[in-house]
Amino acid sequence: MDAFRLAPCGPLRGRLRVPGDKSVTHRGLMLLALAEGEGRLFYPLKAGDTLSTARVLQALGAEVREEGPHFLVRGRGLRFQEPEDVLDCGNAGTLMRLLLGLLAGQEGLFAVLTGDASLRRRPMGRVVAPLRAMGARVDGREEGERAPLAVRGAPLRGLRYTLPVPSAQVKSALLLAGLFAEGVTEVEEPTPTRDHTERLFRHFGLPLEVEGRKVRTWRTGPFPAKDLVVPGDFSSAAFFLVAALVTPGSEVVVEGVGLNPTRTGLLTVLKAMGADLEWQVLEGEAGEPVGWVRARHSLLKGVAVDPGLIPLMVDEVPVLAAAAAWAEGETYIPGLSELRVKESDRVRAIAENLRALGVEVEEGPDWLRIRGGGVRPGRVRPFHDHRIAMAFAVAGLPVGVEVEEPHWAEISYPGFFQDLLRLCAAS
């Protein structure tokens, strides 16, 4: 089994820009594919998950072409063509769930959605059930709970739906379906989740009302394509921020990064742990705040994390665990039920890798209790999960670590290890 060995890293020094935001890239490609005319997606993420989105949209008749670091998209004007083959979503759960909403109202169109072994294990019933309540015709394994899933586009009616658990993917799938439904579609969230879909609806002039935690949309007519600049992905930036915090003498600045407040819960938690962090919003594109973040090495202390922050940092919990391993005292992270059904069972993956690095950890059904103080050199497993691979490269960086199957990082950050080594070498 291949492994990447990271020698102990001295201070990390330098500035960097991380790849484009994965969530915005997925959604931007989809909405441009629905639009009329031609639009460009500037500085998108070009990695495993988003390239799957580009290929699926091509199979549905949209023209998606790479132009240097950008995508050029010629849309279909609200009507996709029926694909000739199964639509392969790869490892991308966001793609599969949003695509269900996008296709549900394409009357008469038939499509089958599948993915890799990990994606075929992930729960889809949370999207399928409310779509069926709108009139969607969706079937699949375990009565639609698992892919492969078959969709036959049908007339949809608006729905008022309260999310049982916070999920930006379910919210987004229903909003996309609502663009083709008769009447109003309203989604109410128990707590706020990332709002990239709502911001992009505004960017493209699509129908949208937001009232507290309720979001509404309704049937749209044809809309023109618009260019879109994708900010750097905060979830990717988080690895370098934590690497700087836990490695003595380090100072790192991440520039051009998205600072959407529905994504930056990690900054709140790290500040509570005593992190030396500064950030500033400089500009916004398509309604997305963009700016810089500076991190300097800090002596962190354990904290009890507010469970209400978890939806605002759901993808950053693995790298928070890396920070907690170096913090003095105990860190308690509750509200992790959603992490059980990510690309891996992330609660288990975090616990097993912390133990492999000599860290004491307790694992509950939806919580972790981490007793920090430092890690020892070891070998970690990604469990086929890009964020686990990168988080535990960071956790072991100050003392040296071997990361099995490092290629999993390419799902969201193809140049991750090169960027990490460059910052180490800069000192």
Curated annotation (Swiss-Prot):
Subunit comment: Monomer.
Residues engaged in binding 3-phosphoshikimate: 22-23, 27, 167, 169, 315, 342
Example GO BP: amino acid biosynthetic process
Free-text function comment from the UniProt entry: Catalyzes the transfer of the enolpyruvyl moiety of phosphoenolpyruvate (PEP) to the 5-hydroxyl of shikimate-3-phosphate (S3P) to produce enolpyruvyl shikimate-3-phosphate and inorganic phosphate.
EC number: 2.5.1.19
Pathway: Metabolic intermediate biosynthesis; chorismate biosynthesis; chorismate from D-erythrose 4-phosphate and phosphoenolpyruvate: step 6/7
Keywords (A to Z) from UniProt: Amino-acid biosynthesis, Aromatic amino acid biosynthesis, Cytoplasm, Transferase
Annotated GO MF terms: 3-phosphoshikimate 1-carboxyvinyltransferase activity
Record-linked PROSITE patterns: EPSP_SYNTHASE_2 (PS00885)
Catalytic activity: 3-phosphoshikimate + phosphoenolpyruvate = 5-O-(1-carboxyvinyl)-3-phosphoshikimate + phosphate
EC class (word): transferase
SUPFAM superfamilies given in the database record: EPT/RTPC-like
Annotated HAMAP family: EPSP_synth
PANTHER family: AROM/DEHYDROQUINATE SYNTHASE (PTHR21090), PENTAFUNCTIONAL AROM POLYPEPTIDE (PTHR21090:SF5)
Entry-linked NCBIfam families: aroA (TIGR01356)
Gene: aroA
Compartments, record wording: Cytoplasm
Family: Belongs to the EPSP synthase family.
Annotated catalytic residues: 315
Major place of residence: cytoplasm
GO terms for cellular component: cytoplasm
Pfam families listed in its UniProt record: EPSP_synthase
Organism, scientific name: Thermus thermophilus (strain ATCC 27634 / DSM 579 / HB8)
Residues noted as binding phosphoenolpyruvate in the record, renumbered to the chain: 22, 93, 122, 169, 346, 387
Protein name per the record: 3-phosphoshikimate 1-carboxyvinyltransferase
